[in-house]
């Protein structure tokens, strides 16, 4: 036995309490010659093998029955490649010793990770197939600076934490190990002896694939190839582009009718993608697909930020789905949740026995609304983990945009908290300065590294500058959900038409602040759950009036400045609330033509017409693109405005939000001439009453509303019409 190996060290190593396994295991120079040491539980015999010749150059002595072997090669002084021939249960196995390989992480990578400025930390941390010194295997690395010991456990070592303890890189707090023979498809986790001496089994924060819930292991999976964003996809995200988003929960869009099981990613590629294209949508927005343990969270409590959920297939199946969407001309938006994470033991919570990813004080680190933990954005490594994740989805999967969830909960320390339940920032204010800087930095990096990709904020307050560039004090998002518009307009639409005249401002107020941000008009999943009813069911009146109200509302929404977002099921007026455990009510579209078909046809026509006419989308965020023609006729609940493109072409939009047709309704126009009715939500095609203007109307040289020329229209009941100028 080497005099250098103390019995206490062997005991600590075997017990899993030794933090520096490379100082003991592997090949070491001693005065007696090269000494090879190995910890091989359950082995009976071990030889050192020279790979070139296959010759046994020495036998290791078992110094501890629990599996510690040691042997001196007296004629050898210089390190050489070797293997170990190990006899387990009477059978000899030839293995490469993990402890003969040097440090894995380059000094520059280690420094960047410590500084929190590594743009792509996922290329270094996690599990990566590799070849070292001619040996194939997988290199593992994990950030756990306060752990006393970390081991890789998995299918390749019987989930035994004694077999593969890792090397600590003290300068960065990262543990690393190359395990020969570990390969793609095998499951693994990290076993940590934490800062308090407790044993923890953790999934890899950087795992590229994970087990199907309720199992929680990570899976070795190669890093996807980089994806470049085409010029067409970049243009589709621009401010002047038509953007109509179909928001989808993959687990409940459609299910197998025989067993209510989910469609796979590939089945969704074959069914959802062509449907969204046929409907005329430009973008698909996916509720979070990051791995998550609880179906009822809809993905908004993720435990595997880098792993697409296995519910619908493999990582490569998900890439197939994204590619299919792109091939169909659809950009893909991913709901992204950097605001909080669940407290499940296998995930990030108290990762190394300390509050590593979250704040230690619950007034900063605990989200009482969702029973989740809040990221510590002030810790550089944590922010780096999240920023890297944003780039990962965009660069490795071709995600075109990220919609950031619950931004308000991130940027305000007192969000949903009473007095005494939150801690002010260093200046005594309520803003979370670290979260604000994190968002600015993330958006800045997206703009620099992935030209054409964009981000969208679900931000529910009046925080100033959400879509202003970081250098001018903004958060740097490209778009912001206009939740104020959504609440105001739905509050208006649910009113009996008799009372709408007293709430006219609900529809007009949005234009007072419309140009303060780059807005998306969202009718999202949040509006059809938790007792809010479906959008259809909020409409007043009998069945005919409900559908007419909904059609009029959609016609108003698609013409109003801002990009469009519609949650699945709303496009055919599903009558019940969304249920994540069941398919949409596709049976409503079965049988003969009905009101649901009418709404579906309307949404399809809205999308295609909206995309065709630049006036409806080119100047969403420019005051020149919108002008009221009639804004004060609250008694008749009539509103008329014009949309305009850069060339000055106009489309007139007129809405009548009462069930009373308005005949001979005169209003002034900017451009005299012949106007064609290009869309009428009351058309019989959509199961309306078919009241309208016979296709074409001509202006009169009669002054109205301060304009020299005017139109005299029939405004259908509970309807919106669009008119395009055809000529003089």
UniProtKB/Swiss-Prot annotation:
Subunit organization: Monomer.
Molecular function as annotated in GO: 1,4-alpha-glucan branching enzyme activity; cation binding; hydrolase activity, hydrolyzing O-glycosyl compounds
Alphabetical UniProt keywords: Carbohydrate metabolism, Glycogen biosynthesis, Glycogen metabolism, Glycosyltransferase, Transferase
Known catalytic reactions: Transfers a segment of a (1->4)-alpha-D-glucan chain to a primary hydroxy group in a similar glucan chain
Pathway per the UniProt entry: Glycan biosynthesis; glycogen biosynthesis
Entry keyword Iron-sulfur: no
InterPro entries, alphabetized: A-amylase/branching_C, Branching_enzy, GlgB, GlgB_N, GlgB_N_E_set_prok, Glyco_hydro_13_cat_dom, Glyco_hydro_13_N, Glyco_hydro_b
Function: Catalyzes the formation of the alpha-1,6-glucosidic linkages in glycogen by scission of a 1,4-alpha-linked oligosaccharide from growing alpha-1,4-glucan chains and the subsequent attachment of the oligosaccharide to the alpha-1,6 position.
Pfam families: Alpha-amylase, Alpha-amylase_C, CBM_48, GlgB_N
Any one of the GO BP annotations: glycogen biosynthetic process
Descriptive protein name: 1,4-alpha-glucan branching enzyme GlgB
UniProt cross-references to HAMAP family, sorted A to Z: GlgB
Active site: 405 (nucleophile), 458 (proton donor)
Highest taxon in the source lineage: Bacteria
Matching NCBIfam families: branching_enzym, PRK05402.1, PRK12313.1
